Amino acid sequence: MTLLSAEENAHVTSLWGKVDVEKVGGEALGRLLVVYPWTQRFFESFGDLSSPSAVMGNPKVKAHGKKVLSAFSEGLHHLDNLKGTFAQLSELHCDKLHVDPQNFTLLGNVLVVVLAEHFGNAFSPAVQAAFQKVVAGVANALAHKYH
């Protein structure tokens, strides 16, 4: 459960309504794979990940980034039950894909960087603080099956 104040909730809701999920999702996943190259091992089937430009231009990275951010977006509607919302994804990533749960935190932090880049001054420290709470809550929910 992620508890946001009314003001924090308003920050998240207002900004998220302006997010291009496809663009931001692709960029966030791409940056994760570039900045933390060991995460690429989970995406070997995506083809060319040999350079930053190859990763950022890879259509499979963009498509999966959209899928990831669409799931994140769904979670924003269930902040009071993130563990339930992400239970199946947590189980998949834990039992089948064997993803290091720390990667969820890394992706959340990369998402915050991408949002800051896209929204500039509108992504104020207060907005960032609200999003940091949300991405931490989502990362915790996705890591739930690991405990």
Swiss-Prot record:
Red blood cells. The keyword Amino-acid biosynthesis does not apply. The modification N6-acetyllysine is found at K60, K83, K145. One of its GO terms (biological process) is hydrogen peroxide catabolic process. Heme b binds at H64, H93. GO terms for molecular function: haptoglobin binding; heme binding; hemoglobin alpha binding; metal ion binding; organic acid binding; oxygen binding; oxygen carrier activity; peroxidase activity. SUPFAM superfamilies: Globin-like. The keyword Transport applies. Involved in oxygen transport from the lung to the various peripheral tissues. Belongs to the globin family. This is Hemoglobin subunit beta. It comes from Eulemur fulvus fulvus.
